[in-house]
A protein has these predicted regions:
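Non-catalytic cap/lid and distal C-terminal segments of serine-dependent acyl enzymes
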Residues: 1-224
């Protein structure tokens, strides 16, 4: 009874490109994992905006998932307001978005996790690619240069903002057959160079739901 009355620890869980807020519910066992740990899971929709603050009104998806959503859901539900009880995670586009959110709003999150995170560089862009074209990148990030520096700059901003205070814990995982393995290895090395302690794992598999299901279970067990 005492556990039931306590404010719930919370996982904010972000979907990937061309996904939606129901993906995690329908394609993984997140409901069971959350029930076993007695945590709340908040799954917002962000279209294909890469959880970046756009130029037009109503497109501030970065501020939404990093700050506004946290304040809103805490007013609506019986959630813990403790930073240590608040985690953000996601896959692919959502993985990169989760890491970015925790770095830009570190006061809100005790931990952040990305699975198969899409820390895009110009090597992923091609005029023939069905999604990642140079024009697409400019439309989302403003420029290709902004896209390439977005996530590393977020880490640097976190270091400056926290000024010696404890950073959010960071967890990264990617499949060894995933096309994003190279950019995840690069981001892992960057975190090492910056002295950011983090968990990094490479697992058998590709850009696929079985890996993401296993990954989110590990994330929940690690942080809750």
């Amino acid at each position: 009874q005492a556990q039931e009355n306590r404010p719930l620890k919370t996982l904010y869980l972000l979907h990937g490109l061309y996904g939606c807020h129901t993906d995690w519910l329908t394609l993984t066992n997140i409901r069971r994992y959350a029930t076993e740990k007695h945590i709340a899971v908040i799954m917002p929709a962000a279209e294909n905006a890469f959880y970046i603050d756009g130029k037009l009104p109503g497109q501030q998806y970065g501020a939404f998932v990093g700050d506004e959503l946290i304040r809103l859901t805490r007013r609506l539900f019986h959630l813990s307001t403790e930073r240590k009880d608040t985690v953000i995670a996601g896959l692919s586009m959502g993985g990169a978005g989760a890491i970015r959110a925790a770095c830009l709003y570190p006061q809100n999150f005790g931990a952040a996790a990305g699975i198969s995170s899409a820390f895009l560089t110009r090597e992923q862009l091609s005029p023939e690619h069905p999604v990642f074209t140079p024009e697409w990148a400019k439309g989302i990030f403003g420029s290709i240069e902004n896209m390439e520096s977005e996530y590393k700059n977020a880490v640097l901003k976190m270091k400056k903002f926290m000024q010696g205070k404890a950073y959010p814990q960071i967890s990264l995982e990617c499949g060894t057959s995933d096309g994003f393995i190279g950019i995840n290895r690069d981001f892992h090395r960057f975190l090492q160079e910056q002295g950011i302690e983090h968990y990094y794992e490479e697992s058998p598999g590709g850009h696929e739901w079985p890996l993401w299901d296993r990954g989110i279970k590990k994330i929940i067990n690690r942080f809750f």
